[in-house]
Amino acid sequence: MTNKANLPSNESIMNTLAPEQKKSKANAQPFSVFVPAAYEDPHVYRQVEELLDQVCQVVSPVWPLKDWIAVNPYAGLSERSFHESRDYLRVFSKCELLPSMDHFSAHYQSGSFAESHIEAALLENSPGKDLSQKKADVLKALQTRLHTGDASKQTMPEKSSLPRIATIADRLSAHGEVDWTEIVKDEIGKHCSAHYDEGQSTWASPWRNLPLYQAWRNKAKIDRGIEILGLTGFRHFVDELPHTVEATIVHLLQRLNIPRALWETFLLAHAFSLPGWSGWTKYQGLQTDPTGTGRMQFDDFRGLLAMSLAYDVAISEAFLFEVNWSSVLDHQSLSLMDSDNDCKSDRKILLRAMEIAYRDDLLAKLPVRELTTDHVADEDFEEPTNLATKPAVQMAFCIDVRSERFRRHLEQVDASVDTLGIAGFFGLPFEYVPLGQSSGDTHAPVLLSPKFALREKSSPCVGDCATSRNDTAEKQVSVRNGKKLWKRLQTSAVGCFSFVETIGLFSGFDLATRLMSPKFRNSLRIKHPSKLHDVEATPLDLDHLVEQGIDLDQQTDLVEGLLNSMGLSDDFAPLVVLCGHGSQTDNNAMAAGLDCGACGGHSGAPNARLAAILLNDRRIQKRLSDRGIEIPAETHVIAAWHNTTTDQIEWLDLDAVPASHQSRIVELQNVADAASHLTREERLPLLNESCTDSLISRASDWSQTRPEWGLAGNASMLIGPRELTRGRSLDGRVFLHSYNQTTDPKGAVLESILTAPMVVAHWINMQYYASTVDPTLFGSGCKTIHNVVGQFGVLSGNGGDLQAGLPNQSLGCGLKMQHLPLRLQTVVVASRESIDRVIAKHANIRNLLQNGWVHMVAIDSGQKYRYHSDGSWVQLRTENTSRAESEWQVVGGTC
């Protein structure tokens, strides 16, 4: 008996598919005119290659655990508008970009936003029109939800049953009793886990050296697992598949009788049915181009599509399950009205209303004045009373939102301290290679490739110092090798049982210590957190930089770029501190996600150490002087490390500090300790703790699923001078990047900030947004059921899709969400003309702003302007920004 699933008209393709179906980017040929020729035909081959590349472009990569960073899951959609992307994704997936009405109702009830913000949101899209009826409809929808449901419920909306274009496994699962979707996920997950294993498994896959598809094909031909579950004849089916990925994909699509106009959409449905493994195989392709030539081979991603398609075809043929694809094409040109169209429209408005409410609150905290060299303030500006005229210390932090609280309290405790904000890799993109290893980790944003390798070395000093440090280096190598040997003994097939019988008792002592004496273990960790992160165990090998072609001139270029990016080219304080940051947790597989994103998910301490060493080099200072940057002889630069879990500062390489600065260091340490205590006190309510010691204990609590909130709550980025925000609480929600337009007449520094740090901040913002709004697709579920797989990722339970996003514990506690899903609001203190030049030059920045992925406000000559999607600027009144939108004074606009 044949099961025919004729798609109803409301499952047709939306008009948003039209651009993708009409034209290919390479040769402007519509996919629907594919001739039924052999795959070997060069013309067909080129079109298939282009088709697969376009599918791959929509998927965002997933980084391994050791380098895990926040990634924008929607990065491949930036050429579309934010709301169009929502409609586009829902054609082939259950993806959701908008929070639920329950979410908006709860925040409206709590006063997070008001009617004026709803009105402003409506006027943004329809200026000058009478929108009173639409506003009344939105308010009615909010009130209805308040009275009919629990407005404190989840942030994400309810899922629909199936997307319009779904996999065969999804459709059969919806019509039958067997969940073939989960079975296929488990089968693919089982194979991918073994194929990419990095040493966790005792027995490695015999086909791990083959490409993913070929390895799967060899295994699937002899694996009876899925046949036992009901898919009979699968081994024979796989044996008859073509040997190459591209040929297999074409063969399987034709076997399903899918019209060529739907190939791309159907492949996207398969990619988004496994977002984790799709992202992981996309990452594998990125690693095929380490030199940045742009010629990457995404063979494994294509292999994953072929594998998923194979299961679909086998299921379709085994159960005689067919889809009437012609009904989809029949309604392809129709304008589809979603069943949730009105609700969706309301949620679009309410999302923007909440963003405007936050923007108003942020801008209200900033002084309204023209930032000039003579600091002429208007009546609304109050100069902080504790601001010193000449700083004794200048301390640079990462732009990470967790630095905002600490910087504020540091300046509050001591007015002679000035803080600056810069990307935490300090402009030094390198691979950090620990002593005794041949390779290391990249300490740079993932958008950049490392320019050189920074190696640790044995100490060149003599006497007891050399003996001590050489011993330390040897111990590091021995400890690493010992851990590997110990792990092999624990997991070996022969020794694992005897290991438990003989050594297990001793492990009980460590278990008892963890449970009964947490304060003792905590004191050991907190006193020297840098040693846990290997940030100053051994000196750095600068001679190796020269061997790689990074001579003094290039080293000078690097630190000159660093100083210019910070806006620190004169008026140096006697003591300059470069403070990297990292997190300190125990038993946390996703620990890298709490470290410095600008350092690729690693500690920023090595970057700070290298930058300090280079800036103290008199030869480099001489070259900087020749370039117009004079570092006084009495200025000394040191490195530090901000522990974001405990909010403590670890001071690095203090043995290199001259005697003239020792007393200053001691004073600064006392100031930092006081600031640490104040910062922890401010964070207490957020983590529901009663004393600051509890926050410190979280760093060593192996049962703690939420050691810190990370970057939860991030909502904006401010690019401007510190005087604009000094003494003002921004609630730890703002990326703060130092910038002074008066020292950047050509706009080069502004361009570098908008094209790099702002993009990284946007990625982080979108990762938190997506994991909050759509945790099923872009989150990673509950930490308590995570299992590390292959040392590179985590599974939720014992199989299925790779978990790609943030866990629930990083976003909220129970029904209370710590992260509020808002798109990034960037505030730039610069002229609109200079910003426009950057936007006009860089299409990716233009896409982010004009397509609604990022919002921007410029503070120009004391006035505030909002960037509009058409490239113009809308002036905002300072006392009531929302109401000012109704005036719509359009200014400028060159794009």
Curated annotation (Swiss-Prot):
PANTHER family listed in its UniProt record: INORGANIC CARBON TRANSPORTER SUBUNIT DABA-RELATED, UPF0753 PROTEIN AQ_863
Native source organism of the sequence: Rhodopirellula baltica (strain DSM 10527 / NCIMB 13988 / SH1)
Entry GO terms, CC: plasma membrane
Record-stated family: Belongs to the inorganic carbon transporter (TC 9.A.2) DabA family.
Quaternary assembly: Forms a complex with DabB.
Any GO molecular function: zinc ion binding
Protein name: Probable inorganic carbon transporter subunit DabA 1
Membrane topology category: Peripheral membrane protein
Phylogenetic placement of the source organism: Bacteria, Pseudomonadati, Planctomycetota, Planctomycetia, Pirellulales
InterPro entries found in the cross-reference section: DabA
Residues engaged in binding Zn(2+): C398, D400, H581, C596
